[in-house]
């Protein structure tokens, strides 16, 4: 049985376009094989921005922590445990002001940890999370794929690659604010991409 971690970053929760697409993908995946799904709504999780105080707890022994320090350490430790036990990561990724949502950046700051998910070596960083697959469902009001304005794709490939995850797949749902006809066509194309992905996921 595969463990599937679903991370939704839309401000609209389950009503967001990217969240709807991750839901459709997981539903279809459940029909093809036995999976265990762990779902995280990053908007309601309400992670604070990473602070120096929280980062300091990562190098502390749990027995030496105060209650407040233990609570800060738990942010990263719990998210890391979810990521490490997952086989497949499914991400609902809207675009806000040409970049990723701040809630997803807060998640990245907790899981991209030197000494845990990657290490620095004389030959450069070495990731520790090989063998996982990522599917990113990128919903956008305009059309950015393949242009300099698409900052998400290279950044997310870079940060997952840092952790050793190189099988990163993007499904684009673009032009959603460019008229009903264009949006419908984009949805159709995205759903067709789902059926193509499923055989490779099983």
From Swiss-Prot:
Note on cofactor: Binds 1 FMN per subunit.
Cell wall biogenesis/degradation in keyword set: no
Domain of life of the source: Bacteria
Cofactor: FMN
Enzyme class: oxidoreductase
Keywords: Flavoprotein, FMN, NAD, Oxidoreductase
Enzyme Commission number(s) of this protein: 1.6.5.-, 1.7.1.17
Record's subunit section: Homodimer.
Role according to the record: Quinone reductase that provides resistance to thiol-specific stress caused by electrophilic quinones. Also exhibits azoreductase activity. Catalyzes the reductive cleavage of the azo bond in aromatic azo compounds to the corresponding amines.
Protein's recorded name: FMN-dependent NADH:quinone oxidoreductase
Upper classification of the organism: Bacteria, Pseudomonadati, Pseudomonadota, Gammaproteobacteria, Alteromonadales
Gene symbol of the encoding locus: azoR
């Amino acid at each position: 049985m595969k463990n599937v971690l679903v991370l939704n970053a839309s401000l609209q929760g389950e009503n967001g376009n990217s969240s709807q697409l991750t839901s459709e993908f997981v539903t279809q995946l459940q029909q093809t094989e036995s999976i265990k799904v762990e779902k995280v709504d990053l908007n309601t999780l309400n992670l604070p921005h990473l602070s120096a105080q929280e980062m300091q707890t990562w190098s502390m022994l749990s027995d030496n922590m105060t209650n407040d320090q233990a609570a800060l350490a738990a942010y990263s430790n719990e998210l890391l445990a979810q990521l490490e036990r997952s086989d497949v990561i499914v991400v609902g990724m809207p675009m806000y002001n040409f970049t990723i949502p701040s809630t997803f950046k807060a998640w990245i700051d907790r899981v991209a940890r030197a000494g845990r998910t990657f290490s620095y070596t004389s030959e450069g960083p070495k990731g520790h999370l090989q063998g996982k697959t990522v599917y990113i469902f990128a919903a956008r009001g305009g059309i950015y794929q393949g242009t300099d304005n698409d900052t998400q794709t290279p950044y997310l490939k870079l940060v997952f690659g840092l952790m050793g995850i190189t099988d990163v797949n993007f499904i684009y749902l673009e032009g959603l604010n460019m008229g009903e006809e264009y949006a419908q066509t984009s949805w159709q194309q995205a759903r067709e991409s789902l059926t193509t992905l499923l055989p490779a996921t099983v």
